[in-house]
Amino acid sequence: MPVINFTYEELFEQLGEELPKDELINILPMISSDVESYDDVEVKAEFFPNRPDYYSVEGIVRSLKGYLELEKGIPEYDVKKTDTTITVDSELENIRPYVACCMIKNVKIDDNQLRNIMEFQEHLHWVIGRDRKKVAIGIHDLDKVEGPFYYKAGNPNETSFIPLESRENLTLNEILENHEKGEKYAKLLKEFDKYPLIVDGNGNIMSMPPIINSELTKLTTKTTNLFIDVTGTDINAVTNALNIIAANLSENGATIETIEVNYPYHDNKTYPDFEPKIIDVHTKTAQEYIGIDLTADKIVETLEKTRFNATKINEETVRVTVPRYRIDILHEVDIIENIALGYGFNELPAQLPDFATVANPDSKRQFDQILEQVMIGLSFTEIKSLMLTSETQHYTKLRKEVEEDRVTVAQPITQDRTMIRKSLINSLLEFLEDNKHEELPQKIFEIGDVAYINENAETKMVTVKKLAAAQISSVANFTTIKSIVESFVANMGFEMELEDHDDSAFIKGRCAKFTTKPLNKNTPFTFKGYFGEIHPEVLTNFELEYPVIAFEVEFSEVE
């Protein structure tokens, strides 16, 4: 989780009053922070990935003002509508299609603030941007450029500019090959014939997203006006990132000015988009979740402390206005969590359960531990990944047809979380892609649930436990993975039978499936699986440069 560093001095200056340091340390957990360390000068506080609005000191201060009742409700931001536009090139639709921009004027930047802005940007890159793949952010000195602005597709060999922290004019390809940031993020653009550029009205290149800004628009302590650009592959994530940046960087009296994005392939949009979300909270539901009696008036009071606007509709319902920077609020239950925060977790009465229980080991967890011990004994390292994935990651990149029995998300928030996985193989390949800069060989495994539709099941869905493992190395081949599977099966106390298997994710003729039979007749489970060498086209899709071998097994109870 992101760790935010700030000094007492800068926090108290923005807060408008000074607190005893020990009091601040005790308050921070009350606003969903985990204080990692502190001394007489600085605090290091950890915040959950669902609260990116806390990733700068301005967001922390905003919340503290509510908790201390120095301010209540949603802050009022000075937003000025302008005629400034950014026009999007049609060629970017299949490269990096979305952009959101705004201007922030009359900011005050000293050395500390400059450092904070850079750290804020990088935290957002990691949490919302998935290390710039989904979202990338550029923050520029507005006074060095002029509108209107353009989001263009540039020729990699014919277009050049001076990248940040450089003195030499480089082509876009040279930046990817020779610049530190270019080398690190080249994988995000290399497959395309043209690369995205942010250009001003005079033809000055401001940015090459998601790689690097121009030296021309570099921020300094003399900068007073900012141009913010956010580009990406998911319009919701792009919008969320810009809204959070605009809100946080304008907390200290700066003025936000809008920019309209003109698309050839999407509806035009004006940013920032501060149109709030409205959610109704029911007093009875809040009482049941929190475990105390709450009136509608008390709910309004607690929500205003947590920086929401709230209106009592009647004794049963409170209408809540959610600011756009609170991207963690999706449902009534999220509002109820904030009611508890505003009420104060330390104020909730402690109550012992009125029944006694006896703890026993969880048999499913014990089984997982056996699997973990076997795989660790084979020199594999365990990973954990999300169950949600997308059809592109799960099927297309593995050369598979989309299956009808997959479980899909009805209203996905992002394009890369649209279904529940049916296999663990793609999760392993994604992990290897993210870690391809690390030393080889890499040997990883995962134990996790997958799901698929079954109309005969009570819930119309079946969940199954699987284990998958993968190895990337220069010498990985079918013989290697066959030996690994044989060792795994033997260590589990089984014997196996092999058959030829054809799977489009694997090289034809270098893939097999197997069934198993326990050596101990009292073994309560069995398993089957498949293994082989990953197909070169799949390796290319995941930008992997060395052979990969993998196996996957599915467990079931003996009837």
From Swiss-Prot:
Its EC number is 6.1.1.20. Keywords: Aminoacyl-tRNA synthetase, ATP-binding, Cytoplasm, Ligase, Magnesium, Metal-binding, Nucleotide-binding, Protein biosynthesis. Mg(2+) binds at D328, D334, E337, N338. Its cofactor is Mg(2+). It catalyses: tRNA(Phe) + L-phenylalanine + ATP = L-phenylalanyl-tRNA(Phe) + AMP + diphosphate + H(+). GO terms for cellular component: phenylalanine-tRNA ligase complex. SMART domains: B3_4, B5. The keyword Cell cycle does not apply. It is an enzyme of class 6 (ligase). Residues 274-350 form the B5 domain. InterPro entries: aa-tRNA-synth_II/BPL/LPL, B3/B4_tRNA-bd, DNA-bd_dom_put_sf, Phe-tRNA-ligase_IIc_bsu, Phe-tRNA-synth_IIc_bsu_arc_euk, Phe-tRNA_synthase-like_B3/B4, Phe_tRNA_ligase_beta2_arc, PheRS_beta_core. One of its GO terms (molecular function) is ATP binding. It is found in: Cytoplasm. Its main location: cytoplasm. It comes from the Archaea. Tetramer of two alpha and two beta subunits. Belongs to the phenylalanyl-tRNA synthetase beta subunit family. Type 2 subfamily. This is Phenylalanine--tRNA ligase beta subunit. It comes from Methanosphaera stadtmanae (strain ATCC 43021 / DSM 3091 / JCM 11832 / MCB-3).
